[in-house]
């Protein structure tokens, strides 16, 4: 994977993303390779939020952490009734925490990823969340 950014950190971080990302996240690779780490991380997490909204049939006004808590919380369309209650809470908190930590801040202010590895790991976290959502989509279909 070729990056326009130089230095060992940028190259190593780009190599982390040299994997088959979820099809809805493939477009963030180009932003990352251009050194637009903040945009790549934000765009990846935004895709997670969009997918949760689609699967839960939530209104567009319900956003961020509130969307995650409603969608995966008790009685939420994406909550898995087969899971142990603690595991259901864990999934809800995983999604709420990821969105609250990595998607919300750049929505409201400038966030600087000085470490490209951190930004690549945000993209990989979004990839995992999208794969979990694929499994959820199959269950709620």
Enumerate the predicted regions with their spans:
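Structured adenosyl-cofactor binding patch, chiefly the S-adenosyl-L-methionine
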Residues: 119-137
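Amphipathic alpha-helical interface elements
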Residues: 1-98, 112-117, 135-141
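Histidine-centered active-site/metal-ligand motif
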Residues: 107-108
């Amino acid at each position: 994977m070729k990056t326009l950014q130089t230095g060992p950190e940028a190259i190593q971080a780009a190599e982390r993303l040299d994997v088959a990302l979820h099809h809805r996240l493939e477009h963030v690779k180009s932003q990352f390779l251009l050194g637009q780490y903040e945009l790549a991380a934000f765009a990846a997490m935004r895709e997670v939020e969009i997918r949760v909204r689609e699967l839960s049939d939530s209104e567009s006004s319900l956003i961020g952490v509130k969307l995650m808590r409603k969608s995966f919380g008790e009685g939420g369309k994406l909550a898995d009734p087969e899971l142990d209650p603690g595991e259901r809470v864990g999934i809800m908190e995983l999604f709420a925490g990821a969105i609250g930590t990595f998607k919300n801040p750049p929505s409201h202010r400038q966030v600087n990823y000085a470490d490209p590895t951190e930004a690549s790991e945000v993209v990989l976290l979004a990839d995992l969340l999208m794969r979990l959502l694929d499994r959820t989509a199959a269950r709620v279909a």
